[in-house]
Amino acid sequence: MKKIRIGSRDSKLAIIQSELIMSAIRKYDPDIELELITMKTTGDKILDKTLDKIEGKGLFVKELDNALYNNEVDITVHSYKDMPLEENPELPVVALSKREDPRDAFILPQNGENGEPIGSSSLRRQLQLKELFPGCKTAPIRGNVQTRLKKLDSGEFSAIVLAAAGIKRLGLESRIGRYFSVDEILPAASQGIIAVQGRVGENFDFLKLFHSEESLCISLAERTFVREMNGGCSTPIAAYATIQGSEIILKGLYCNETTGELRKECVSGNRNNPVELGYELVKKMKSSKSI
């Protein structure tokens, strides 16, 4: 009997996302034995600093990557938006989920009181919030979803902004006060998509029922744009792609950190060329005098 060991962060959301993959594997072959192995990453342990002050998104994958290298697990599970833009060729992304809701969500405290500040450690979100609500104050917040909700409900923040996909997967949709449209707050590249990583050269047929070619297409466009604009975890760059028939529509956001000016651009092209479309949006964005 074949056995597959799945590596995951130990947060409730990460485990739920891993269970979605395990369910798809069972549908593919009920005889495959599955083992979930959870671990705490460095990014989960360091909560008193924003990601740009430590090592960025790589801190959420380092321990999981090591587990793959050391053959302690066979695949690892990630929120794709939290993975480094420069992917490791020895540990490729081997499957992507269908995209959940890509929007950001506005979460209010259970007591319903409003005030300041709004909690978000994402500069991408902070700058778009300030453009949407001039004069609003924001402050960084770290931790998993449950930790952030506790901080919100204890009165540390008047509201927090989180990815809607995670809130929905946790069954906490009732906590959402409102959704931000993608025109109000452009999401992070690959937001709402779960990624599975494995070792190069191995067989991953058992992920066929889980993998979404559409997610691969839109992620290639989004991540190419953000990577080529030099966007890391703290850089205010965002991208969102949709497929309409044979075309991809790709929207991008860039902030000039010197002037604080936000710029948005949009391009469209053949869905068979997502990487080229990402480069096209980079060229269009960089042609602006404000970049």
Swiss-Prot record:
GO terms for molecular function: hydroxymethylbilane synthase activity. Binds 1 dipyrromethane group covalently. Pathway: Porphyrin-containing compound metabolism; protoporphyrin-IX biosynthesis; coproporphyrinogen-III from 5-aminolevulinate: step 2/4. Its EC number is 2.5.1.61. The modification S-(dipyrrolylmethanemethyl)cysteine is found at C233. CDD domains: PBP2_HMBS. Disulfide bonds: none annotated. GO terms for biological process: protoporphyrinogen IX biosynthetic process. It catalyses: 4 porphobilinogen + H2O = hydroxymethylbilane + 4 NH4(+). Monomer. Belongs to the HMBS family. PANTHER family: PORPHOBILINOGEN DEAMINASE. The porphobilinogen subunits are added to the dipyrromethane group. This is Porphobilinogen deaminase. It comes from Ruminiclostridium josui. The gene is hemC.
